[in-house]
Design a protein with these regions (language model features):
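Carbohydrate-associated surface elements
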Residues: 39, 62
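Nucleotide-activated donor-binding/catalytic signature segment of Leloir-type glycosyltransferases, i.e.
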Residues: 128-144
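Conserved acidic donor-binding segment of nucleotide-sugar-dependent glycosyltransferases
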Residues: 184, 194-196, 200-207, 216-221
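Aromatic "clamp/platform" in nucleotide-sugar-dependent glycosyltransferases that forms part
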Residues: 162
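Membrane-proximal helix-turn-helix segments that form the acceptor-binding/catalytic region
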Residues: 13-33
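Short hydrophobic beta-strand element within catalytic cores of glycosyltransferases
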Residues: 179-183
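A conserved mid-protein helix/loop that constitutes part of the nucleotide-sugar donor-binding site
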Residues: 79, 88-105, 122-125, 208
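A short, well-ordered alpha-helix in the C-terminal region of glycosyltransferases
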Residues: 209, 216, 223-237, 249
Length: 253
């Protein structure tokens, strides 16, 4: 028998039309199409002009690290908001996060909070210039670093991406109890974030709601502790053992 052919697709919503035929051909020639999220089935069918969905299955990315933050360390978290990202404005839109942060810094109720950015990329100089132009005083660029200590020490995590597949940093923030607040731009986010329990999804472009959501958490230490615990527990859905087991079941089917 012919070996099964598995295609592991990463979601890109602005795919060139010339690839649409490739989607259809790939579907016809493969035994299974593996998507990062079941929510991408409709997108794939739309790209490929397909009606049959029987070959689809979904397997998410596993968490990046073996360790999960112990609950006893949650009270030690600092008043820090974290961004871990490649500095690529087209996709990541960190400029939007900095605009939101301006609202945070000008709110007298939120004195003492800081924003740390871990990462690097071609847009870094633009972001540093934006920090200067907005006169932001509590923003630091940490460069290319192992992010674990930042996740452990930070209370909140921001993501303002235009598109993602299944973002590893979102998994990572959860496993270290760093509560994510995310612009709702990708269907897969709804499989990762349980609204109001382990994080928040905010309507894309609603800068004020993003700011108010952050403010509510910043002012409520008790709720942050509860949500941090739920974030850690929810990330265990994506342990390496569980994801490997899904792949093994698929390959042995």
């Amino acid at each position: 028998a012919l070996a099964k052919i598995l295609i592991y697709l990463v979601y890109k919503p602005y795919m060139d039309k010339r690839f649409h035929r490739l989607y259809k051909t790939t579907y016809e020639q493969c035994d299974k199409i593996i998507l990062l999220s079941s929510s991408y089935k409709e997108d794939y069918c739309r790209f490929g002009g397909l009606t049959d969905k029987s070959k689809f299955t979904s397997i998410p990315n596993a968490v990046s690290f073996d360790d999960f933050l112990d609950f006893q360390y949650i009270p030690r978290k600092q008043n820090t908001v974290l961004i871990v990202s490649r500095f690529d404005e087209v996709q990541k839109r960190i400029s939007l996060a900095l605009q939101i942060w301006k609202l945070i810094e000008t709110d007298k109720d939120l004195f003492g909070w800081e924003l740390k950015l871990v990462g690097f990329g071609e847009s870094e100089s633009d972001y540093k210039e934006q920090v200067k132009s907005l006169n932001l005083k509590h923003v630091s660029f940490e460069g290319k670093q192992n992010p674990v200590k930042y996740y452990k020490n930070s209370s909140l995590f921001m993501m303002t991406s235009l598109f993602e597949g299944w973002p590893m940093t979102l998994n990572e923030s959860l496993q270290f109890g760093c509560i994510p607040i995310v612009y709702d731009t990708c269907a897969s986010f709804h499989e990762i974030i349980i609204q109001g329990e382990n994080g928040y999804l905010v309507t894309d472009g609603d800068e004020r709601m993003f700011y108010l959501t952050m403010k509510k958490l910043m002012l409520d230490t008790g709720n942050r502790k509860i949500m941090s615990q739920k974030a850690i527990e929810s990330s265990k859905r994506f342990t390496l053992d569980k994801i490997v087991n899904q792949w093994e079941n698929l390959l042995n089917d």
